[in-house]
Amino acid sequence: MCAHKKVLFSLFASFFGFTVANATTVKLGTSDLCLKAAIPVAKRLNTPRGLLQAISLKETGRWDQKRGMSYPWPWTVTAGGKGIYFATKKEAIDKVQALRQKGVRNIDVGCMQINLHYHPNAFDNLDQAFDPLTNTRYAANFLTNLYKNNGSWNLAIERYHSGNTESGTKYRKAVIHLKEHAAG
């Protein structure tokens, strides 16, 4: 396995709980914050392995030409169906404030794209909303409650995205594909 592929494999394997012999050490950066945040949250809430990472990738995935793969991005803001990736947390917060000043209310933020309109009490402030661990923890608690209420992780994934069955089903299929692809 070439060094580049070994680094990528090692990075994803560590996020999904696999041990890699002779793995190259990988320094985590902004592009790794969402995946890193999901690890302790998933363990604490006993969500299926790789599910939070796959949802984060589906919600905020962006392509990295150097890595040759997509990764979730913590400073993502989505409004009007358009996701925007910002270089810093401050830029993302500034964008949300500007959108709110324009009267836009339906805004998704952070690693797990929590909707600030439908989840108005999720965070005390925008700094918390964009904190990868806090954002992921809220999403995982919400997802776990959906699982308890629906009796199925598949339904929980669908409802996490939408109450619309058709849209939810498409979303679930995409998330499961990402989960299986990254773990396999």
Residues covered by each model-derived region:
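Generic low-polarity alpha-helical segments
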Residues: 1, 17, 51-52
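Bacterial N-terminal signal peptides that target proteins for export
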Residues: 1-8
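General helical structural elements
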Residues: 9-10, 176
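Bacterial N-terminal signal peptides
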Residues: 10-17
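Sec/Tat signal peptide C-region and signal peptidase I cleavage site
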Residues: 19-23
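Catalytic glycan-binding domains that act on GlcNAc-containing polysaccharides
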Residues: 24-184
